[in-house]
Amino acid sequence: MSNLGKVIQIIGPIIDIKFDSENLPDLFNALEINAGDRKVIAEVEQHIGDDTIRAIAMEDTEGLKRGMEALDTGKSVSVPVGKEVLGRLFNVLGKPIDGAGEFISEESYPIHRPAPSFEEQSVEPEIFETGIKVIDLLAPYEKGGKIGLFGGAGVGKTVLIQELINNIAKEHGGLSVFTGVGERTREGNDLYYEMKESGVLEKTALVFGQMNEPPGARMRVALTGLTMSEYFRDQGQDVLLFIDNIFRFTQAGSEVSALLGRIPSAVGYQPTLATEMGALQERITSTKNGSITSVQAVYVPADDLTDPAPATTFAHLDATTVLSRSITELGIYPAVDPLESSSRMLDPRIIGEEHYEVAIKVKNILERYRELQDIIAILGIDELSEEDKLVVGRARKIQRFLSQPFTVAEQFTGMQGKYVPIKETVRGFKEILEGKHDNIPESAFLFQGTIEDVLKKAQQMEI
């Protein structure tokens, strides 16, 4: 028998509904409110008194009024999962919003699910090879790890994300789920068409809950994307989950918390900030079947890293990739800052002695070059000692060798994209550090894949 209630109060996206006291819906149950020509989905957040629940709408509440009927579905919001979701674009409720025709999925999962138990989780730290030299060498990703992607507007976050999607699809046969949380609709639209053009769309599912949507949708859309990823992981796949932007997840939670009347905590954030973040992040993990590796774009409000939202996110991250405007000004792409980016995988016990030594030496030489730049700016390079001149020469070659042509940017750059295995990356940088290529001009190192490509370019330049 269906369990019906009546809407008794609506304040923006918050809806109070009266049920029989013995048939009160459970927390997180989805409710369908019949608004005549459409059904509005809301999620139960609080029980008020004996017979009333407070729900948050997942869709626009326009047209709702008191006295309307609400049906308790008896389960939480469920979204479609399976290979059918690839190449399609969904909203928080798992409804397609790409206008690409009817969508039929055989299976659906609830968005609220427990995290894998300790027994199910994989404990062996394993490197996730991206084929992008600067990441693999200096701040490697962990399979099933969480990576923070930091960078302002226009420094190449989207292109880096697309290249990662392309590389996992083509080199590892893996899949990707892109979750747009509270960002601009225009950016989502651009991403969709760019993915279509670069040919990575059929290996990706996209889930959007953008800036103009109610806070309930923005708060839950990350769980929708995560649920789709979990299905693929449980089928033995390696999945790449992108969350853009994790700050908006916290921001939406803060709005909902205030609307529900909870007393705010530090800087006006919700008192449950750490719990909500933990519930999301704990589900992103490797199991013995497969892995979910997540790359999360992190907006830092007013560049304050001590703000509770980014500070809570940091506690969960295994690696950080920092994109820097000063590197884009040098014309080096991807504009990953080799000194600011970090990873807990940079450990000789995980990556091996050789890789570790090369990475540390590369960081040291770039650090020394940064120190010498002031002297060069004032006195000129001729005033440096012979040893320092050698350091500067090698550092500039390393800096350029950290650049790389991307497959997804081929149509703009005219350069064929390169995927570089970790072994080749380590070998190339080791040879530069050993001085084997001191006689090769700097320009030969720019936008090349392996060290062999550099040697070929140098030969062409001589002709």
Curated annotation (Swiss-Prot):
One of its GO terms (molecular function) is proton-transporting ATP synthase activity, rotational mechanism. It comes from the Bacteria. Disulfide bonds: none annotated. GO terms for cellular component: plasma membrane; proton-transporting ATP synthase complex. Pfam families: ATP-synt_ab, ATP-synt_ab_N, ATP-synt_VA_C. It catalyses: ATP + H2O + 4 H(+)(in) = ADP + phosphate + 5 H(+)(out). InterPro entries: AAA+_ATPase, ATP-synt_VA_C, ATP_synth_F1_bsu, ATPase_a/bsu_AS, ATPase_alpha/beta_chains, ATPase_F1/V1/A1_a/bsu_N, ATPase_F1/V1/A1_a/bsu_N_sf, ATPase_F1/V1/A1_a/bsu_nucl-bd. Its main location: membrane. ATP binds at residues 151-158. The keyword Ion transport applies. The keyword Translocase applies. It is found in: Cell membrane. Its EC number is 7.1.2.2. Keywords: ATP synthesis, ATP-binding, Cell membrane, CF(1), Hydrogen ion transport, Ion transport, Membrane, Nucleotide-binding, Translocase, Transport. It is a peripheral membrane protein. Produces ATP from ADP in the presence of a proton gradient across the membrane. The catalytic sites are hosted primarily by the beta subunits. Belongs to the ATPase alpha/beta chains family. F-type ATPases have 2 components, CF(1) - the catalytic core - and CF(0) - the membrane proton channel. CF(1) has five subunits: alpha(3), beta(3), gamma(1), delta(1), epsilon(1). CF(0) has three main subunits: a(1), b(2) and c(9-12). The alpha and beta chains form an alternating ring which encloses part of the gamma chain. CF(1) is attached to CF(0) by a central stalk formed by the gamma and epsilon chains, while a peripheral stalk is formed by the delta and b chains. This is ATP synthase subunit beta. It comes from Clostridium botulinum (strain Kyoto / Type A2).
